[in-house]
A protein has these predicted regions:
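N-terminal leader/targeting and accessory segments in enzymes
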Residues: 1-94, 98, 352-355, 380-381, ...
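ATP-dependent carboxylate-amine ligase
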Residues: 1-17, 43, 182, 196, ...
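Phosphate-binding loop of NTP-binding sites
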Residues: 8-11, 91-224, 228-238, 432, ...
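A short helix->loop->beta-strand "cap" motif at the edges of active sites that frequently abuts
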Residues: 64-67, 80, 214-219, 236-239, ...
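Short, polar loop motifs at secondary-structure junctions
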Residues: 69-76, 224-228, 245, 394-398, ...
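Short beta-strands and strand-loop turn motifs
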Residues: 72, 107-108, 185-191, 223, ...
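Acidic-glycine-rich active-site phosphate/pyrophosphate-binding loop
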Residues: 119-123, 257-275, 320-323
Length: 461
């Protein structure tokens, strides 16, 4: 990171410096909340979590080489410097906002109900063909993760692609205030976090507030096939630019050739040109991701050849449409998270398989009052997509299985349906359900811990 002095840090987070004044002009080399990631001259931020209080690690990290710590507690007569703050979490955000303002860099902010991470990966892949890019790693997209990502920006970076996730009203504005995006991308307005945000209109309002702190001359890029985003009215004179499968969107595709699990070929149309590219990861949702990449690349001055190369170089990441050729099965690992829309997209991908199609699906969280109906909807959709075997795991997924069975009876489909309360129950019956060369989709909300299933299938002797 670009170095900051302790004096600058104390001012930025409205803290009180405690210690030898000789250290005030010393510069920190990094910021960490994890004691295991402390290196020489790190600033350690003592976050108090649900299970662990970072304050208990302050002596340890100072001995390990940290330059200073942010603390909510009076540490007394210690022989190392610290900065006293009222809230370490708020101080972390304030410091990240200050650091972002010191950087001469373009920022692309990405949010949405579905596809934030895969869209982030696509946009970063595209932009990397022209720029030195930093992107959000993993799921570091909240009030803790976003600041830590911002601190990883170095002076040589030209563009930062930052994922911004929310679950409650009021979550977005602090993130946007830190990121100060030049380009705002919203992938869609779906049903994730309905439990907290009430309605899709509530989700739109909260996610749309990302534009409140953006560059006044920046670009707003939305999915034009999403009914809620299409209804979004411009703010402060910024009218969204739309991408989508429909030709009315300035950025769209024509001549789509779907090649099953080998991906998609398409002709991409921009306001001024058109070009062809191959998307290696299957599914129409990946076409949307690529279109977002095209629109962002276009906004940041890239040419068609650069954008096409970036699209074609994208590789999947674990837990998100990652195709694994295991010894006995082909596994579609999409188990990082789930909601009704992403479940359907994944079942669409499974439908491309040439072998027997098996879906192992689990509970979806934070869907609010309609959660049972939404699980039933997914079960019926699995039958509609001609899935051969549906395995439902979890309490909520019992309704998914019941709806699937009802659909099979009503439509005379040939899908076999199983329900298990736990993963362990499924493991005991796995040998009777799965067959050699099956193509298996694995997907559920994060709390279901389905990577364990992927690991078990991958390592089966």
């Amino acid at each position: 990171m670009k170095h900051m002095t302790l004096s600058e840090i104390a001012d930025a987070c409205c803290g009180i410096y405690c210690g030898d004044p000789a250290f005030l002009d010393c510069e920190v080399s990094s910021v960490a909340i994890d004691s295991r990631k402390v290196v020489k001259d790190t600033l350690f931020v003592a976050i108090k979590g649900a299970r662990v209080d970072g304050h208990s690690f302050i002596p340890q990290v100072m001995e390990a080489g940290a330059l200073c710590s942010l603390s909510e507690q009076d540490l007394g007569d210690v022989d190392y410097p610290y900065i006293r703050v009222s809230s370490c979490t708020e101080a972390l955000k304030d410091l990240a906002e200050h650091y972002r303002r010191s950087l001469d860099i373009k920022v692309v902010g990405i949010t949405g109900s579905v596809g934030k991470t895969s869209t982030k990966e696509m946009i970063a892949s595209v932009l990397s063909e022209k720029y030195n890019v930093l992107k959000t790693e993993g799921n570091f997209n909240n009030e803790i993760g976003l600041p830590l990502t911002v601190f990883n920006i170095r002076e040589e970076h030209e563009v930062a692609v930052l994922e911004m996730g929310i679950s409650h009203f009021g979550d977005m504005k602090p993130l946007a205030k830190i990121a100060r995006p030049d380009v705002c991308v919203i992938t869609n307005i779906g049903y994730a976090h309905l439990e907290n945000l009430g309605t899709r209109d509530g989700i739109l309002k909260e996610k749309g507030s990302m534009t409140d702190y953006m560059n006044p001359k920046g670009s707003v890029i939305f999915n034009g096939d999403d009914d809620k985003l299409k209804s979004y009215t411009s703010r402060d004179g910024r009218t969204p630019v739309y991408f989508g499968l429909t030709s009315s969107c300035p950025f769209h595709v024509e001549n789509i050739e779907r090649k099953g699990l080998k991906g998609t070929y398409a002709e991409f149309v921009t306001p001024t040109s058109r070009f062809h590219a191959h998307i290696s990861i299957p599914g129409d949702h990946m076409i949307y991701n690529a279109l977002a990449g095209v629109a962002v690349g276009y906004a940041l001055g890239m040419d068609n050849d650069e954008i096409a190369r970036g699209i074609e170089k994208l590789v999947p990441i674990a837990g998100r449409n990652n195709l694994i050729e295991a010894k006995h099965y082909t596994i579609i690992d999409d188990c990082y998270n789930a909601n009704p829309a992403s479940m359907k997209s994944s079942l669409d991908v499974l439908a491309y398989a040439d072998t027997r199609k098996v879906a192992i699906l689990g509970d979806m969280g934070e869907l609010g009052a309609d959660e049972l109906a939404m699980h039933r909807e997914v079960g019926a959709y699995a039958a509609f997509k001609n899935t051969d075997v549906l395995v439902c795991i979890g309490a909520l997924s019992k309704d998914m299985a019941e709806a699937a069975k009802e659909t099979v009876l009503a439509t005379e489909k040939n899908m076999k349906v199983f329900h298990f309360d736990t993963k362990e129950d499924f493991y005991q019956n796995m040998g009777q359900i799965l067959k050699e060369n099956d193509t298996i989709l694995v997907k559920a909300s994060h709390f279901m811990e389905f990577p364990e299933i992927v690991k078990k299938l991958s390592e089966e002797a």
